Amino acid sequence: MEASLSLFRPVATCCRRVALSSSSSSSQKAAAVAGISVRYQSTANRTKRMLNIPPHESFLNVPVEGDRIIFNPPSSEASVYHTPFKFLPRSDPRRRANIYKLFKPPQAPITTPESSSTDAAAADQHGDLPPVLYNPTKSYNVTPEQVEEIRELRAKDPKKYSVTYLSNKYNCTKVFIMMCTQAPREHQEQHKLARARTAENWGPRRAAAKLDARRRKEMLHRGEI
C-alpha cells in the first residue's frame, strides 16, 4: 500500500503544479484584459499621423535643371505688358513704351486760360516730356508799417496774437512773423513751464525716445550723422 502511494505521489505533485500554473495564467490574462487602454481618434499620435499631409507640388523646390522665372499670374489671361523692364531686350519696342509710361504724368494739371497757350507751345516744342516745374513767385506784401504793427500786437498780448494768428492776418508765413518779432520773455518762460509739466507725465519709454531724438538733432547740427 505504501509502495503504491509512493508511486502516485509524483503524479499528484505534477497535477497540482499544472493546476496552479493554469490558474495563475488565467488570472494574469484577466488582469491584462482588464488593464487594456482603448485608443480612439483623439489620440495624439493618430491625430499627428493624420495631419502629416505631404505638401502640395507648388510648395516643393524646383530642381536645379529646371530653374526658370516663376510668374504667378492672376485669374485672367496673361498680358505682354506685364513683362518686367529688366527682362526686355534692348531692341524690344516695349522698352520705349515703358519709359513713356514712367514719365507720363498721372493726371492733367489744372491750367488757366493764359497758361494753356504757353503749355501747348511748350508741348509742341518738347514733345512728350513731363511738364516744366516752376518755382513759386515770392510775394513781399508786408509793409514796414505792418511790421511795426505786428511787433506791437505781439508784445501787447502774445497769447491772443500768436504766430499763426498774425500769419493768417497779414497773409505771410510763420517764419516771417518769427523773424520780425519775438514773444516777451515772460511768455517764453510760461511756455517752457507748460512743456515741463507735460514732460512730467511722460513714461520712461517716451522720455527715452524724446531724449534720443534730441541727441540725434544735436548730432545732425554738428554734422556727425
Curated annotation (Swiss-Prot):
GO MF entries: structural constituent of ribosome
InterPro entries cross-referenced by the UniProt entry: Ribosomal_mL58
Segment forming the signal sequence: none
PANTHER family: 54S RIBOSOMAL PROTEIN L20, MITOCHONDRIAL, LARGE RIBOSOMAL SUBUNIT PROTEIN ML58
Annotated segments matching region Disordered: 106-138
Localization terms from the record: Mitochondrion
Quaternary structure (record): Component of the mitochondrial large ribosomal subunit (mt-LSU). Mature N.crassa 74S mitochondrial ribosomes consist of a small (37S) and a large (54S) subunit. The 37S small subunit contains a 16S ribosomal RNA (16S mt-rRNA) and 32 different proteins. The 54S large subunit contains a 23S rRNA (23S mt-rRNA) and 42 different proteins.
Protein name: Large ribosomal subunit protein mL58
Keywords from the UniProt entry: Mitochondrion, Ribonucleoprotein, Ribosomal protein
GO cellular component, one term: mitochondrial large ribosomal subunit
Role description: Component of the mitochondrial ribosome (mitoribosome), a dedicated translation machinery responsible for the synthesis of mitochondrial genome-encoded proteins, including at least some of the essential transmembrane subunits of the mitochondrial respiratory chain. The mitoribosomes are attached to the mitochondrial inner membrane and translation products are cotranslationally integrated into the membrane.
Main location: mitochondrion
Composition skew (Polar residues), residue ranges: 109-119
Family of this protein: Belongs to the mitochondrion-specific ribosomal protein mL58 family.
The organism's place on the tree of life at top rank: Eukaryota
